Amino acid sequence: MSDRLDDDTISDRLPDDWIHDGDAITRTYTFEEYLDGVAFASEVGDLADEAFHHPEITIRYDEVEVRFTDHEAGGVTSQDIELARRTDDRR
C-alpha cells in the first residue's frame, strides 16, 4: 500500500487539467464521437488493470471522467498521480 499524499504534495505533483477533489483526483476528457470515448475508457481500464489500481470511469455521450483514489490509504497516493500521467499519455 502506498502512503497518502498531503494536499501540498498533491498540488505540486498533479498533472495539468486534473482536479484534486477531496480524497481523489479527477479529470474529464472530451470526445467528438461517443465510441472514441468508449475506446479511451477501455484503454484506461487496461492500464489500470496492469497496475492493479482501478479508477472510477464514467462514460457520457461526449465525455469520459476518470477518478483515482486509494481507498486503503484513504486518499491520493503517488500511484494515483503516476496513473493520471499515464492516462494523459493515452489521449
From Swiss-Prot:
<dbReference type="Pfam" id="PF01329">
    <property type="entry name" value="Pterin_4a"/>
</dbReference>
<dbReference type="InterPro" id="IPR036428">
    <property type="entry name" value="PCD_sf"/>
</dbReference>
<protein>
    <recommendedName>
        <fullName>Putative pterin-4-alpha-carbinolamine dehydratase</fullName>
        <ecNumber>4.2.1.96</ecNumber>
    </recommendedName>
</protein>
<dbReference type="InterPro" id="IPR001533">
    <property type="entry name" value="Pterin_deHydtase"/>
</dbReference>
<comment type="similarity">
    <text>Belongs to the pterin-4-alpha-carbinolamine dehydratase family.</text>
</comment>
<dbReference type="GO" id="GO:0008124">
    <property type="term" value="F:4-alpha-hydroxytetrahydrobiopterin dehydratase activity"/>
</dbReference>
<dbReference type="GO" id="GO:0006729">
    <property type="term" value="P:tetrahydrobiopterin biosynthetic process"/>
</dbReference>
<keyword id="KW-0456">Lyase</keyword>
